[in-house]
Amino acid sequence: MLIDSLIKKSFSYDSRLLKKNELFFDFVSNQKKKNPFIDEILKKKPYKIITEHPFKKKNKFILKKKVKIFYNYLVKKKYSKLPENLVAVTGTNGKTSVANFYYQLLTLNKISCASIGTLGFFYNKKFQKSNLTTPDNLKILNFLKFIKQHNINNAILEASSHGLVQGRLENLKFKNAIFTNFSQDHLDYHKSMKSYLSAKLILFKKYLTKKSNIICDDNIAKLLSKNRISNKNFNLLLQSKKKLPFKLISHTAKNFQTTL
C-alpha cells in the first residue's frame, strides 16, 4: 500500500464521526480482541481500516503491529506544514482568558493569529464552535493545517489536563508555553493532586521544543524546578512583580467573552 495514497485521504479514529472513503484507525482492536463496533464501521464504507487484528475481509483492512505508531508516522507526513509559532497555555484557571487575550492582542496589532480552546476556534476574526477545551488530535491538526494554508503562523492552544493525558496534542511541538497557576481541581478524574500535576507536566516533558520559553510566576517556577522541568533546556520567563506598562481603556463582556 503506497503511503502517498493513504495520506491523501481524510483520517478518522472515531467511529461515530467516520465518513465514507475516510482512512480509519482502529485503536480498539488488538491481535486477540476485535473492535465490537467493526460491523458498524464497515457499513460506513471507509477507504481502509488500519488495525492490529487479523480480520477475514483482508481487502478492507491494513494489518499493522502497532496502529498508534503507524498513525503518528502518517500524521507527520500528512501534516508536515503547520504554523511555526505554536503557544500552549495550561493551568487550573485562566487558560481561556490568556488564549483569548493573546489572540486579541496580536489581531489588534495586525498580526495573523489563531486560537483554539474553550471558546472555540478563532482565526482572522472568524469563529468555529468547539465542545472541548482541548479538541481531539485530528481536529487540532486539521485546523492548524488549514490556517497555515491561509498564511497564519501564530496559534495559541489551551492544553487541559484531560487533553494532555489523552494525547490530544500528539505530533505537535510548542516554542512557548504558559503555566497560569495550579490548585485543586478535576480530582474526580485525576484522583489525586500528584496525578493532576503529572498530567500538567506532560506539556513540558513531551511537547516543548529545545530552548523554548516557559512563562509563569515564582510559585510555578518553584513547582517546575522541584519536578526537574527547569533543568531541561528551557528559558523561564517569570512574571514581573513590578507595575506593568498597560492601562485598561475599555472592556465589554458578552457571554463567556471579554474584550479589552
Where on the chain are the PLM-derived regions?
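Active-site regions of enzymes building and remodeling cell-envelope glycoconjugates
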Residues: 2, 47, 57-68, 128-131, ...
